[in-house]
Amino acid sequence: MNLLSPPRRRTLAVLGAVLLAACSPSGPKFEASDITGSSFGRDFSLEDPKGVTRSLADFRGKAVVLFFGYTQCPDVCPTTLATLAQAMQRLGPDADRVQVLFVTIDPERDTPALLAQYVPAFDPRFLGLRGDAAATARTAKEFKILYEKVPGATPGSYTMDHSAGTYIFDPKGRLRLYVAYGQGPDVYAHDLKRLLDASS
């Protein structure tokens, strides 16, 4: 993934400041930014690799980890998915109460078959989701995700600039946390454990 342009970096910095300001002073203590009560990120309607339309309601009862990326991403996406796989290992049996979702921002190249191969390679419980160009744009807007195609040497060799953070929902389907890119598996495992314990 290429670095975002200065205006986009400023936009993300502003968003980060807003997210930090939203931290709740009470309740469980999280390592990530507590964004409980946010008015964005309410839901999505996307298809899994089998063509089944999915929304947050399908995963009620589980903590949901939502990440936006693309399969040909050279760094951020595989790093984040590998980190999440390590977090699942740290959670032990509790990992079965967590659903990691990978939403592609490159539906042009990320076919259902490719998502079915790529995403579970990190952990067989991980699920890839996609929509057409309009659904992708609509979902990205709902979750304040920035993405942009960066032309390559050939029409099919483009890359994608995109926001690199991760969202976490509690088992009741409420958006609770924003995890900045670069956080390790212990941060995810710690915060997911707290959300799961609070819902027990």
What is each residue range found by the language model?
Residues 79-139:
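Structural microenvironment flanking redox-active thiols in thiol-disulfide oxidoreductases
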Residues 2-18:
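N-terminal secretory signal peptides and thylakoid transit peptides that target proteins
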Residues 24-27:
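Bacterial signal peptide processing site
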Residues 57-78, 84:
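Short active-site neighborhood of thiol/selenol oxidoreductases, capturing the structured segment around
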Residues 41-42, 64, 163-165:
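Short loop/turn microsegments at loop-to-beta-strand junctions
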Residues 20-22:
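C-terminal motif of bacterial Sec signal peptides marking the signal peptidase cleavage site
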Residues 135-191:
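Thiol/disulfide oxidoreductase modules built on the thioredoxin-like
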